[in-house]
C-alpha cells in the first residue's frame, strides 16, 4: 500500500511539474536568454556579460562601448555593465531588445554547430537584433551571408547549446 501511495504521489508531483514547465518548453526555441542563465558570461567566468561592454551602446552609439562598474544590472545569470544610467534604464525596461542573440555566443559559431566566445568589437545588428562574433575573420564570413547564418543558428541553437 505504501508503494502505491508513493507512486501516486510521485506521478502527481511529476504531472504538476510538467504542467508548470510545459509553457516554457513550448516557447520559441530561439531567444536571447538561455535556460538557467550564465550564457552571457565572459570566458574568464566573471559572470560579466559581453566582457563588460554596454549592450545598449551598440544600438544608440553604433559602436561597442565599455561599460562601467557604476552602472550594473544582473539579468539572466550575468552582470551587465553600462556606460550610463540612461543605458541601464533602457536595458532594464527591455532587456531582450538589447541583449545579444544566442546567449551572447558567436553567431557564426552557433550556425556552424559550435559554442564559441566572442570579441565585443565583432558585431552586427540585423533586423534590430545584436549578433556578436569571434574575431575579424569570422565576422567577414558572417557578413557574406548574414541571413543564411541566422537561419542556421536559429534552427540549431537549442541543440548546439546542449552539447
Please name every model-derived segment.
Residues 6-9, 21, 46:
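A generic signature of intrinsically disordered, low-complexity regions enriched in glycine/proline
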Residues 2-14:
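Bacterial N-terminal signal peptides that target proteins for export
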Residues 13-22:
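Bacterial N-terminal signal peptides
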Residues 26-163:
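Charged, low-complexity intrinsically disordered segments
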Amino acid at each position: 500500500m505504501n508503494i502505491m501511495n508513493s507512486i501516486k504521489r510521485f506521478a502527481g508531483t511529476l504531472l504538476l511539474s510538467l504542467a508548470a514547465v510545459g509553457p516554457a518548453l513550448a516557447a520559441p526555441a530561439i531567444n536571447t536568454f538561455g535556460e538557467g542563465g550564465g550564457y552571457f558570461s565572459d570566458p574568464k567566468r566573471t559572470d560579466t556579460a559581453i566582457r563588460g561592454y554596454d549592450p545598449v551602446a551598440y544600438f544608440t552609439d553604433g559602436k561597442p562601448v565599455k561599460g562601467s562598474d557604476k552602472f550594473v544590472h544582473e539579468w539572466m545569470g550575468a552582470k551587465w555593465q553600462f556606460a550610463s544610467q540612461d543605458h541601464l534604464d533602457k536595458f532594464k525596461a527591455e532587456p531582450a531588445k538589447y541583449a545579444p542573440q544566442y546567449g551572447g555566443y558567436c553567431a557564426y559559431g552557433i550556425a556552424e554547430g559550435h559554442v564559441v566566445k566572442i570579441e565585443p568589437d565583432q558585431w552586427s545588428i540585423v533586423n534590430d537584433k545584436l549578433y556578436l562574433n569571434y574575431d575579424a575573420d569570422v565576422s567577414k564570413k558572417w557578413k557574406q551571408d548574414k541571413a543564411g547564418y541566422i537561419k542556421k543558428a536559429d534552427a540549431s541553437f537549442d541543440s548546439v547549446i546542449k552539447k
